Amino acid sequence: MRGYLVAIFLSAVFLYYVLHCILWGTNVYWAAPVEMKRRNKIQPCLSKPAFASLLRFHQFHPFLCAADFRKIASLYGSDKFDLPYGMRTSAEYFRLALSKLQSCDLFDEFDNIPCKKCVVVGNGGVLKNKTLGEKIDSYDVIIRMNNGPVLGHEEEVGRRTTFRLFYPESVFSDPIHNDPNTTVILTAFKPHDLRWLLELLMGDKINTNGFWKKPALNLIYKPYQIRILDPFIIRTAAYELLHFPKVFPKNQKPKHPTTGIIAITLAFYICHEVHLAGFKYNFSDLKSPLHYYGNATMSLMNKNAYHNVTAEQLFLKDIIEKNLVINLTQD
C-alpha cells in the first residue's frame, strides 16, 4: 500500500514538472505569472541576458498602476518599507497621485520588438567630445535621467529619449525640453515628492517645504507621459546591487542610490541587453567637468553626503569587467 502511494506521489510530481515545462518553456527567460498576466509588454527571449544572475525577479513591471499597486506592494514586500524603498507610510499619497495619471503602460501598444537593446545615458562629463549621438539614437530604448539636456548636445548624446527618470528637484521646467514621445518617470524619495506631483496635476499651489532645493513649480509634461517608478526598483538597486545596509549607524546619513544606478536597475528589468554611456567620473581632477553640460565640476560630487559614489563606481567596474553590460565611454 505504501509503495502504491509513493508511486502516485512521484507520478504527480512528474506531471507537475511536465506541465510546468510546457506552460513556461525551459528555454524561455522566465517571468512571474502575475506579471505576465498583468502587463504582457515585455517580450520573452530565448536566452537569458548577461546580467540575469543579478536579479531575484525577472521582467518585473516597473511602473505602479492605480488599480493594483497595493496588491503588488504586498506581493513584493514594498508594504514593509518606507520611501524610497517602499510605501508603508505613503500608500495614500501613491493612490492619490496615481489616480491622476492616464496610463501605467511600459511601451507603446504598437511596440512589439522583443529582446530590446537599451542604452542608459548618464550625465557624466566623459561624454564631452565623444560624438556618440548617432550611436545612442540607434538603440531600441534610450534611458536618460534628471535634467541632462538633449537640445544643443545632439552630437554628444543623441536626440531620442524613451524614458527619463526625475524627481522634483531635478525635473525640467522649460517647455523647450519636452519631447512628446518621451515617458517621464517620477522616482519618489520622500512623501513630499508625491504630494508635489499631485499638486501640479491638480493645479494647486505648490508647497515647497521639505525639498533640498526648490522644486519645479510647473509641469511641462502631459499626464499621459508620466509614470511613477515602483519603489521595488530603488530597493533592488540599494540592497541587492550596491549592498547597502538596511540600517546605517546613527552618526551617518543614510545613503541612497543615484538616479543613474536606479536607471540601470530599471534597464535590467525591461531590457535584454544593456549598454552604458556617461558613467565615468574623474576623481583625480576635481576641476574636471561633472556633466557634459553646464559648468559644475567634480568637486561637487566629492562633497555629496547622500550617495556612496565609491560603492557605485565599484559596482559599475564589476559589471563592466564581467561583460554584464557594455560601456560605450570606456577609455
Curated annotation (Swiss-Prot):
Keyword Phosphoprotein in annotation: no
Name of the coding gene: ST3GAL6
Topological domains annotated Cytoplasmic: 1-4
Protein known as: Type 2 lactosamine alpha-2,3-sialyltransferase
Keyword Ion transport on entry: no
Membrane topology term: Single-pass type II membrane protein
GO CC list: Golgi membrane
Source species of the chain: Pongo abelii (Sumatran orangutan)
Sequence ranges on the Lumenal membrane side: 26-331
GO BP: cellular response to interleukin-6; glycolipid biosynthetic process; protein glycosylation
Alphabetical keyword list: Glycoprotein, Glycosyltransferase, Golgi apparatus, Membrane, Signal-anchor, Transferase, Transmembrane, Transmembrane helix
Record field: catalytic activity: a neolactoside nLc4Cer(d18:1(4E)) + CMP-N-acetyl-beta-neuraminate = a neolactoside IV(3)-alpha-NeuAc-nLc4Cer(d18:1(4E)) + CMP + H(+); a beta-D-galactosyl-(1->4)-N-acetyl-beta-D-glucosaminyl derivative + CMP-N-acetyl-beta-neuraminate = an N-acetyl-alpha-neuraminyl-(2->3)-beta-D-galactosyl-(1->4)-N-acetyl-beta-D-glucosaminyl derivative + CMP + H(+); a neolactoside nLc6Cer(d18:1(4E)) + CMP-N-acetyl-beta-neuraminate = a neolactoside VI(3)-alpha-NeuNAc-nLc6Cer(d18:1(4E)) + CMP + H(+)
Protein family per UniProt: Belongs to the glycosyltransferase 29 family.
TM spans (from-to): 5-25
EC number: 2.4.3.6
CDD domains (alphabetical): GT29_ST3GAL6
